[in-house]
Each structure stands twice: as C-alpha cells, then as structure tokens.
Curated annotation (Swiss-Prot):
<dbReference type="Pfam" id="PF17101">
    <property type="entry name" value="Stealth_CR1"/>
</dbReference>
<dbReference type="InterPro" id="IPR031358">
    <property type="entry name" value="Stealth_CR1"/>
</dbReference>
<protein>
    <recommendedName>
        <fullName>Capsular polysaccharide phosphotransferase fcs1</fullName>
        <ecNumber>2.7.-.-</ecNumber>
    </recommendedName>
</protein>
<dbReference type="InterPro" id="IPR021520">
    <property type="entry name" value="Stealth_CR2"/>
</dbReference>
<comment type="similarity">
    <text>Belongs to the stealth family.</text>
</comment>
<keyword id="KW-0270">Exopolysaccharide synthesis</keyword>
<dbReference type="Pfam" id="PF11380">
    <property type="entry name" value="Stealth_CR2"/>
</dbReference>
<keyword id="KW-0808">Transferase</keyword>
<dbReference type="InterPro" id="IPR031357">
    <property type="entry name" value="Stealth_CR3"/>
</dbReference>
<dbReference type="GO" id="GO:0000271">
    <property type="term" value="P:polysaccharide biosynthetic process"/>
</dbReference>
<comment type="function">
    <text>Part of a group II capsule biosynthesis locus.</text>
</comment>
<dbReference type="GO" id="GO:0016772">
    <property type="term" value="F:transferase activity, transferring phosphorus-containing groups"/>
</dbReference>
<dbReference type="Pfam" id="PF17102">
    <property type="entry name" value="Stealth_CR3"/>
</dbReference>
<dbReference type="InterPro" id="IPR047141">
    <property type="entry name" value="Stealth"/>
</dbReference>
C-alpha cells in the first residue's frame, strides 16, 4: 500500500527510487549503495559511542603524509637526470601526472586539523621541500626529510613504495598512526575509534575489487604488481592457503609501527631488494598500503570496518557532478567519512584544476 500511495501522490519519487533500487548508485570502493549510506553511517556512529562508553584508553595517534612539490626546479632536475638512468621501472612509473600537485596537501592537512582534533602530530615526509603555506609556529606539523628515514644509498628516490617502506623510522612516531596520501580528505568529524578501537584494534578498510581479475584484464599497474608481490610473502608467512583477493580502498590507512618493524625483521632481504628502484618497479612491495595492513589483520590486530570514501578522478567528466553531490551532502548532514580525488592521465581537461579549487574552497 505504501508503494501504491507513493506512486499516486509522488510519482517522480516512486520512479526515482525504483531506478535507484534496480541500478544503485555507488560512490565508494566498498560497494555501499548511496541509498544505504545514511543507515551505515548511523549504525557505525552508534557502535562507536557504545565502544567509548565501555573503555576510553588514551591512545596517542599521529598522521603521516608523503608529499612532493613537482614545481620545484631542483627536484625536476633530479627527476629528469635519474629518469634517463632508470631501466627496471613499471608501467606509468615515470608519468608526470603521478607527481603533479594541485595544492591538495594544504586542504588535506586542513581536513585533519578540522575534523580530527585529537591527532597528536602531523608528519609530512618530503624530499628537502617545505610547503609554502606552512606556518612555522604550528608545532603540530613536523617536516621529515627523506634523509632522516631512508638510507643514503637509495636516495634520491621517486618511488612512493620505497618512501612508504620506511615510514616506521620517522623519529618520535607513535605506535598508532594513520597514513595519508595528499589526495585524501577527511569529510566530517570522526572519532579516534573509527581508526583505532579503544582496545587497540585498528580498522582495515577493504575494497570489493579483485587482484586476480584486475591482473587477468591486463591491469598491470605498479600498485597491482606490488600488491601481488606482497601477497606472495604474506602467504609465505601465514600459509599458502591464504586467499587474499582484495586491495584496500583509496583512503587513509591506520597502521601500527610494531607490525611494520616485524615485517622488516622477517623480510629484510626482500624489502631491501627493491629499495634501489628510484621509480616504481616490477619487484616492489607496498608495505604501507597492503603488506602491513594485511599482516595486522592476520595477527589479530585489526578488524574489517566500513569506510564510505567517495573516489573519483579529478580529470574525469564525472568530477563536477561528484563535487556538487559532496557539497549537497555537506548541507544536508549526510557526509561520507572521506573522499579521494585521484589524478590519472585520462584526459587533458584544462578546467579540472579550476573546478577542484572552486569545490575544495567551498567544502573547507
């Protein structure tokens, strides 16, 4: 009777809902339908309140960013020099779009400071560069040079996997930290327990993608190859029957320094074998974004957690529609946890940078 009443009184809503049920809109990599987002968010918030009432352990949590300013002439000269010498690099490894900067870091850091006020320190790992907007009086933000955490034999490096493999060496880094790429933005206020439960368990945010299916389609990106290399070592450590098929979503990643150190102690030789790849290579391992999170899960130190992260390409034709949707959700109080505005070389749309800046200024 309710459906019949809706059909008679509000036919436009009836047909809209019918279409959404048959062809659901999905904005995230976990397969959560847009119609279900509010219910998922509400349920998760209720669980977090319950957990906080059970125990409230003061866990210090840091945030770590990796960042490069591709406009820096000295950095450009280094990249050009070593690019000519590189031979064992993977597809897209030297593509300029991988290093292109749209001032995302400023807004990503701003989103952390605005929506995660409980964060202790924000570390920015970079190659002898300092963001132009950084206020020296902001004691929360710490600049970490590559030389502080990476052996000089492997420098300079333009390989994100090499940089990420050494994050646990950041001086004064907390046991519990959250790794960010600068294209990931916190979209709303979030509690500590979204990342680390009061009992110390971390969250792991898995996608519904499939590694083997992507490989079968010929999607042999450096990230996919590194994930499959890491999976091989995980099976060696935890059992060949291990059926890991899904990567993590493109969002922030809760990590434990002690598990990083354990992986290094067990697979030191395998890790060091790819550190000389100045650009992403076919034998890379992606410790921060796959290996360590899965090791944490297999060690019983993390749990599967819903994460509604809107993920889209900054240059795509769909980007403006996603910007509009995120601003609407901000207004109606139905914001996702986060959003990732990825950059790939899918088009030469010259307006994408202007559209991004217009949106991001309105959102924050």
């Amino acid at each position: 009777m309710k459906k019949l009443k809706k059909f008679v009184t509000k036919p436009h809503i009836f047909f809209r809902d019918a279409l959404n049920n048959k062809y659901p809109i999905i904005n995230n990599e976990q397969g959560i339908k847009e119609l279900d987002e509010r219910a998922v968010l509400s349920h998760q918030e209720n669980l977090e309140k319950l957990e906080s009432s059970l125990m409230n352990t003061p866990i210090p949590i840091d945030v770590v960013f990796t960042w490069v300013n591709d406009k820096d002439e000295k950095w450009q000269e280094k990249k050009q020099h070593y690019s000519k010498l590189a031979n064992n690099y993977a597809f897209y490894a030297k593509d300029n779009v991988r290093f292109e900067e749209h001032n995302e870091l400023f807004y990503s850091v701003k989103s952390v400071q605005k929506f995660l006020p409980w964060v202790r320190y924000i570390f920015i790992v970079t190659d002898n560069q300092i963001p132009h907007w950084l206020n020296n009086e902001d004691s929360q933000i710490k600049i970490v040079d590559h030389r502080e955490i990476i052996d000089h034999d492997y420098l300079p490096t333009f390989n994100s996997h090499v940089i990420e493999a050494n994050l646990h060496k950041i001086p004064n880094l907390s046991e519990h930290f959250i790794y960010f790429n600068d294209d990931v933005f916190v979209a709303k206020p979030l509690k500590k327990s979204h990342f680390f439960k009061p009992n110390g368990l971390a969250s792991i945010f898995l996608s519904i993608k499939n590694l083997d299916k992507m490989y079968a389609k010929g999607t042999t990106t450096p990230t996919l190859l590194a994930s499959m290399n890491s999976r091989r070592l995980l099976r060696k450590m935890y059992g060949q029957e291990l059926n890991i098929q899904t990567p993590l979503i493109h969002s922030y990643i809760p990590l434990k320094k002690s598990v990083f150190e354990k992986i290094w102690s067990v697979f030191k030789e395998e890790i060091e074998s790819f550190l000389s790849n100045r650009f992403r290579g076919k034998n890379d391992l992606n410790l921060a974004t796959f290996f360590v999170p899965y090791a944490m899960y297999l060690e019983g130190k993390s749990v599967l957690t819903p994460e509604i992260c809107y993920y889209f390409n900054i240059r795509s034709a769909n980007a403006k529609a996603q910007y509009k949707k995120l601003l609407q959700k901000k207004e109606n109080g139905n914001r996702p946890h986060s959003f990732c505005i990825n950059d790939t070389s899918s088009s030469n749309n010259h307006f994408y940078h202007k559209n991004f800046n217009t949106f991001i200024n309105l959102y924050f």
